[in-house]
Amino acid sequence: MASGIRYDSIFLGIKFGMSQKDFYTHCWELNKQGLILQGPSNLSVQYRLDTTLMRSDTYMWFYPDFQDGELNRMPVEFSYLAWAPWNPMLSSDSLLMDVKQLLERWYGSEFIYLENKDKTKKLWVMVMGNRRIRLFIKNASTVGADITDLYRVKNEN
């Protein structure tokens, strides 16, 4: 952030600083183009990544957080469509590496690996200017990503 360089682009034309109205309007347009759908229980946006981007068809679900009326954080979840407990090739460990490579291609930078002393918390982090991306395993089938605008964040957990 000391460089003063800003990276407001998140993905699919969604940007930090968008109002809720602009976000909904943009998603409505993406939906009309057939690029996105409503996610589970209508609580998220669903985007399907195909095998040209991932090892297996993958769902990406997202819904932003807004602070002072502006998009400041984008929590994202990824899961292979064909995931099953008996299919180790599609475990969250494999998915994590797929998502890591995808995001490195999208954002043009690399992640660094971090863990706490007792190795109970492990994640990959990428910071470019104001945009921080944290990547982690949520459970056996799901990888989480948290894309945050460090200029707009006030209170973090």
Regions found by a protein language model. Give the residues of each.
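A short, structured loop/turn motif at beta-sheet edges
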Residues: 65-72, 106-107
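Short acidic-hydrophobic surface loop/beta-edge motif
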Residues: 47-51, 124-126
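Non-cytosolic coordination micro-motifs
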Residues: 1-40, 78-157
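Short, cysteine-centered beta-strand-loop-beta hairpins and adjacent loop/turn segments enriched
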Residues: 52-56, 82-85
